[in-house]
A protein has these predicted regions:
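Non-catalytic C-terminal accessory region of glycerolipid acyltransferases
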Residues: 2-25, 29, 120-234
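Helix-to-loop junction immediately C-terminal to a conserved catalytic motif
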Residues: 30, 34-67
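Short, glycine/polar-rich helix-capping loops at beta-to-alpha or helix-loop-helix junctions
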Residues: 33, 93-98, 176-178
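Short, basic, glycine/proline-bearing loop/turn elements
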Residues: 37, 104-110, 139-143
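Structural motif corresponding to alpha-helix initiation and N-cap regions
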Residues: 49, 95, 117-120
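Catalytic core of membrane glycerolipid acyltransferases/transacylases, capturing the structured
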Residues: 55-114
Length: 234
């Protein structure tokens, strides 16, 4: 009899609640930054997302964008609900604020010439672990009248070697306080034609050029969209 009562008691026990995954320090930091942006920051730096505006949370991605200001990290940070590691020049850590930000965001710091094996290996490690990386292939902020500065190699190769899709983010004007900025996000794409083969210098150069042409295509597309919006307001 006691065994029957014990069995019935076991049967009516409520299901155990799943323990919530404990957030890492980096995940907590990015969650805090996004809350700050969506509660107040977007009033100061309003961004209109165009193109593929869904959240890119399903896997790791290589985010690639043109570089006009220090605010360029925002479009990548709000494109997903997970952390993203920014590749940046080591010089940003030369002052206290830059060093603090780089440490908090776990940025991947590069030598000025862009050739840094340790940094590349670290970026590959993050991507293989399901984390995303953001790269500005111009290597520095564009303060000229040219659409893009000459690209430094690396973004396409990183995507190919880790078989990680690329998402392009382009802007036509430098983001400013209290001015709406338009950011175009591409759909994810891959350079599958280079997978599972030994890359030559010609392959790398060709992949870099394809990436640049795609960015130019989306740049002109965004420029035309903005122009049409202005014409409709007249």
């Amino acid at each position: 009899m006691s065994e029957e009562i014990k069995q019935e008691t076991q049967e009516v026990q409520p299901p155990q609640k799943r323990k919530k995954k404990k957030l890492t320090k980096l995940e907590k930091w990015f969650r805090f930054m996004r809350r700050c942006y969506f509660s107040l920051g977007r009033l100061l730096v309003p961004i209109k997302k165009l193109g593929h505006t869904e959240k890119f949370n399903d896997r790791s991605y290589v985010f690639v964008g043109n570089h006009l200001s220090v605010l360029d990290v925002v479009p990548a940070a709000i494109a997903l609900d997970k952390p993203v590691h920014f590749m940046a020049k080591k010089e940003i850590a030369n002052n206290r604020i830059g060093k603090w930000f780089a440490n908090k965001c776990e940025c991947i710091l590069l030598n000025r010439d862009g050739t840094d094996v340790r940094a590349v290996m670290l970026a590959m490690k993050y991507l293989k672990n399901g984390e995303s990386v953001c790269i500005f292939p111009e290597g520095t902020r564009n303060k000229t009248d040219e659409i893009f500065l000459p690209f430094k190699s690396g973004a396409a190769t990183l995507s190919i070697k880790t078989k990680t899709p690329i998402i392009i983010m382009v802007q036509c004007k430098k983001m400013r306080i209290f001015r709406r900025s338009y950011i175009y996000y591409s759909e994810p794409f891959e350079f599958t034609e280079y997978y599972n083969k030994k890359l030559t210098e010609d392959d790398i150069a060709a992949a870099d050029e394809k990436l640049k042409q795609k960015m130019l295509e989306f740049y002109y597309q965004l420029s035309e969209t903005i122009k049409n919006k202005k014409n409709r307001k007249k």
